[in-house]
Amino acid sequence: MTELKRTPLFDAHNRYGGKLVDFAGWEMSVQFEGLTAEHEAVRNAAGIFDVSHMGEIEVRGKDAEAFVQYLVTNDVAALEDNQIVYTFMCYPDGGIVDDLLVYKFNKEYYYLVVNASNSDKDFAWMNENKGAYDVEIINISDSVSQVAVQGPKAEEIVQELTDTDLSEIPFFYFKNDVVINGANCLISRTGYTGEDGFEIYVDNDKVDALWDKIIEVGKDRGLKPAGLGARDTLRFEATLPLYGHEIDKDISPLEAGLGFFVKLNKENFIGKDALVRQKEEGLKRKVVGFEMKENGIPRQGYEVKVGDKVIGVVTTGYNSPTLKKNIGYALIDAEYAALGTPIDIQVRKKTLKAEVVSKKFYTRSTKK
């Protein structure tokens, strides 16, 4: 059995009572106090997450912009320096290699943040497609830690630890060389919860003290350490996809309803031809939201039916901590994707009624 990897915050997980599980080969806390308490803390106050398992890959060199532009579906050339964009890397058939954030330092330096489970695959994919581009691709994942502070009180908590005016960092922008709790950090106004907040990148040897200090400053404001369980319910409510669920190698960004992040009018990028063809021919499948009409919690892999016909599969399902409803996402045949369409979910041995609804389960205004 392969030994699980640990983040530099592993000791902190134990100190704060984390319940450890195997997540994509990492030993991580699924929860601390409890999923619902952590979820509600982020919605109403703040939570802190260890996301040091995420991958960070630098692209440097005179062709950095052209290379990243070829790799991803969104338009990175349109970014200002210190701006961030959400995007995909796709296979030639339009399936998704990974979803990622691209941080633009300048035209010759981009910083890509990728999923933990895909980090090695993504690094290999980038090198396979490097071709004649004059770039250096550097996987710095093992030398960088990341914590996310999320929630309506995130800014006031982190502001206590830095002289930099955090209110001046707009949504999806970042600042480098920001001193937080005495450590040099990169801080971005980004997150995976649907709330305002920050993701902070720091050297491994500084992250433990930073974690403790944020909790010390935040606890009287309602901040709680939060695990992977709450991270998943929060992203789910906020219509944020998870690789291996709403997106994967067999699902395109268009099928996932994420065409906004695909710029088909830009010059050639990997997967463009397939995505153009898919759009022209019309989608055969779509990821939709649904709400259970009978009592039962849908889970990934459960069949979706209309009558006796299997029309798709559940990608994520929960009893929503915020909405107090059993809701989910499913990848289904496009002809059944209209809002209000009655469907059935096979929950274990029971066939339960559900209805297609908007995927926008939860929206909170974020700082501009």
Swiss-Prot record:
GO CC, one annotated term: glycine cleavage complex
Kindly indicate whether the keyword Transferase belongs to this entry: yes
Give the main EC class: transferase
* NCBIfam families, alphabetized: gcvT, PRK00389.1
Q: What does this protein do?
A: The glycine cleavage system catalyzes the degradation of glycine.
Its quaternary organisation is:
The glycine cleavage system is composed of four proteins: P, T, L and H.
Q: What is this protein called?
A: Aminomethyltransferase
